[in-house]
């Protein structure tokens, strides 16, 4: 029997549950810093909003860094695989159309972490929001009402300094 790749082994036994909270992380292909351009990072944020508007997930916190994103969600319907496939596919199409790029934007795999205790939520939300500071990046923080993704949550979009 052929040996399974590390990414395939990660997916064995993966089970997603509606209403569970997950921290999702996806990296750009070859860790290319695509989102140094703030307008391109906004296209990813737009897909987060679409997923919420379509009832797939409630966005609790997120950050888009130059070469990856962290997205803290509560899954509402479908699976994590479906959610991430849609988010990555639609953001790739939008970014490729805007830049004239072709091909893949994201690494095929993504990382997910299911929260097991309520206190983990605060810890992970702080990690997401602090990520630009930890990475020594410049961040623009928007409060509810001043941002197109108008929720009662703080939204952090990061750009390289």
Model-derived regions, located:
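Short catalytic/metal-binding and nucleic-acid-binding patches
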Residues: 1-161
